[in-house]
């Protein structure tokens, strides 16, 4: 190589324009894939194993279907509703994200420019150093996991056809509004509400919407509510492990760059999750006499959720404090308050998504308003002088902004989710028929999760040329 020559890896080519940062692009796609693995197969495995045996397939399929459905919604209209040009203060303009010229151009979040009242620029728009295609992929994984988390509130009784209608409607009218308002440059973003990686957009939204939908769908059968043991706790741990390690990309990818703030976010994520898991387990031992594996998983999740709104914005000691709070407050709301509050008893939130995601997400957003560190904020946020109340001065107002942002997300999800459920109920029953509730997977899908000889022979398609559903032919059979 001649002296002074640019190495091939850094030369500008048609496929590697001068604005492309290959390191950022590689990390962003890796982060997106890690988040995708949280859903596929992470939550598919977790849902399929944490429920009663007769609901294993139905629960896993709800997650599988949602993952695919969100992809189509996202690229056809929802991405630009969340991150495109402003239509309303809380909503972007719907248009496809499918054209080559759009997808290979540099990513620009046009509505994220911060302006003074006179119209002059205070902070430029966000322009990550990779193509739009990478951003579409990354954000699609967040949209997918949000609706899959929501599904956890509805396992064991929702009509699968109603769920198939619910997913695109909720993504369109609820998720896109929260995403644009807080991330895409909407009014909460402009005001300075902090949501680093989805404590509000993803977790508070899914927890509140899940509880609301559970109200409209109604409870599981009496026998299922009384006894609903996991069918495979070891697989629950496998799904939980994918969820935990996948959170490295979940929070580490949100600076939209492979920078020092990303490293801080990843470290804080694991500190908070570990602390929360230990606190939840200690409380289980102290009050119930023995540690619970399911309880430990719940503590892990609440820690991951709690750190998410401020993952790259708080110091390590604050991550420990947040872990202590996330391991104890959601534990109290789930194990004590839920059992004493008659209103919560009437709503059947199958996996306690309200506690593990809504309560923990709100807690994380509020504590971010307290502990957001000024220097770390300057590395990530577009709003100048952002900091938590703990650091004094104008930081006190940040806590109020965080509470106001949570109230908007909560109210929007209650109203929109209710409207969606009512509309669907006019066309399709929201619940599985009572007779099918007694049977489970076999009635809904004609399949069983653990079909062994004699038990599963009814649906063994190597013995029958058609499924138990009349009129549905089987093209290919396979011995496994």
From Swiss-Prot:
TM ranges: 31-51, 59-79, 135-155, 169-189, 198-218, 233-253, 265-287, 292-314, 318-337, 361-381, 407-427
Coiled-coil zones: none
Domain of life from the UniProt record: Eukaryota
InterPro entries for the chain: Ammonium/urea_transptr, Ammonium_transpt, Ammonium_transpt_CS, NH4_transpt_AmtB-like_dom
GO cellular component, as recorded: plasma membrane
BP-aspect Gene Ontology terms: ammonium transmembrane transport
GO molecular function: ammonium channel activity
UniProt family annotation: Belongs to the ammonia transporter channel (TC 1.A.11.2) family.
The protein's name in its UniProt record: Ammonium transporter 3 member 3
Originating organism: Oryza sativa subsp. japonica
